From Swiss-Prot:
Protein name: Small ribosomal subunit protein bS6
Organism: Saccharophagus degradans (strain 2-40 / ATCC 43961 / DSM 17024)
Keywords assigned by UniProt, alphabetized: Ribonucleoprotein, Ribosomal protein, RNA-binding, rRNA-binding
UniProt region (Disordered), positions on chain: 96-152
GO cellular component: cytosolic small ribosomal subunit
Gene responsible for this protein: rpsF
Pfam families: Ribosomal_S6
Length: 152
């Protein structure tokens, strides 16, 4: 069996069908004794050029190990499925299991965004604590000034 990298683009109106399509394709690979080494759903993205006046598509990346028969079956499925706008199959020398550069960049930006949100929440909670302390101090000052005015 050989290793392949498969990328296919799904029509944006058919995005809800993507999990079912991926499940069918992975089942076809696994049923024949193959393996799916990497599966990434890149989501809906802007295409480099429009296809049939469509500017966005749902991108899926799969790294699989399978035989020629299964590969031909997948190719046929891609060709006759109207929801699949484009597909690309590349033969690889070995299984690729690490994250793709696109997913790495997305995960890094998500982590940065989460850290920034956490910092903002921490700063907000710290500011609220300071305000609470200040209001307590003001109340204590008001009470002490009232006590002093009563004594006089």
């Amino acid at each position: 069996m050989r290793h392949y990298e498969i990328v296919f683009l799904v029509h944006p109106d058919q995005s809800e069908q993507v999990p079912g399509m991926v499940e069918r394709y992975t089942a076809a690979v696994k049923d024949s004794g193959g393996a799916v080494h990497r599966l990434e759903d890149w989501g809906r993205r802007q295409m480099a050029y429009s296809i049939n006046k469509i500017h966005k598509a749902h991108y899926i990346l799969m790294n699989v190990e399978c035989g020629e028969e299964v590969l031909e079956e997948l190719t046929t499925n891609f060709r006759y499925n109207d929801a699949v706008l484009r597909n690309m199959i590349i033969r690889c020398d070995e299984a690729v299991t690490e994250e793709s550069p696109i997913m790495k960049a997305e995960n890094e930006s998500r982590e940065r965004r989460n850290r920034a949100e956490r910092r903002a929440q921490e700063a907000e909670s710290a500011a609220e604590e300071v305000e609470d302390e200040e209001s307590l101090d003001e109340e204590a000052d008001d009470e002490s000034s009232e006590d002093e005015s009563e004594e006089a």
